[in-house]
Amino acid sequence: MFIEQPARWLRWLYPKATWRMDKNVRAIYLTFDDGPIPEATPFILDTLKEHGAKATFFMVGDNVKKHPELYERIVAEGHQVGNHTMNHIGGFRHWTTTYIINTYQANELIHAHLFRPPHGWMRHSPYYWLSKYYKVVMWDVVTRDYSTRLTAEEVLENVKRYTRNGSIITFHDSLKSIGKLHYALPEALKWLKEQGYEFRTFE
């Protein structure tokens, strides 16, 4: 999605999904999609640890299979894990059965009760089935750290501009994002703490 906050029509498509947490609590929920990979995950974990922050990692099963030591480190350091399918497959390019099987294959490695669809969307049929067994977590703020059109400073500005109580903030644990995260992530964590936000993970 090329938007920092989801449109109302998108929220309407997935009414059972979680888009934002309690707006009356000064807390936010950090999420990282697409990892784990050795080029990005260690830096993210080190930075989170330095700032005393916990996050939820929506991981691709194939990456977990390739880098089990990173999965183990994420869990050992007290972060939450979520399913992001086995092969980061698009929700509109595959049959429902294929999509669900791919998700279940990933969960044999990830062992999660949380799910986020790659690219933030999927057909209604897999959504219907997966929402029976997973808590489907979407987002309230997309930092767009993956965009080649944005600078690291602009990624940080997206966090500052759109974050509010209960925001689910999406970063990416990926090659496309890591260059910007070296600056944007520590600065974002510092700013969030200065604003009095508590870092939380999902039940």
Q: Positions of the model-derived regions?
A:
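His/Asp/Glu-enriched short active-site or ligand-binding loop at hydrolase and phosphoryl-transfer sites
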Residues: H113, W121, P126-K160, G196-E203
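A short, conserved beta-to-alpha structural element at the edge of catalytic cores
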Residues: E50-E77
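Charged helix-capping and loop-helix junction motifs
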Residues: E69-E72, T96-T103, T151-E157, H182-P186
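Acidic-and-aromatic substrate-binding clefts and catalytic sites of carbohydrate-active enzymes
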Residues: G35-E39, F58-H67, I89-T97, R116-R123, ...
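Catalytic grooves of carbohydrate-active enzymes
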Residues: V159-E203
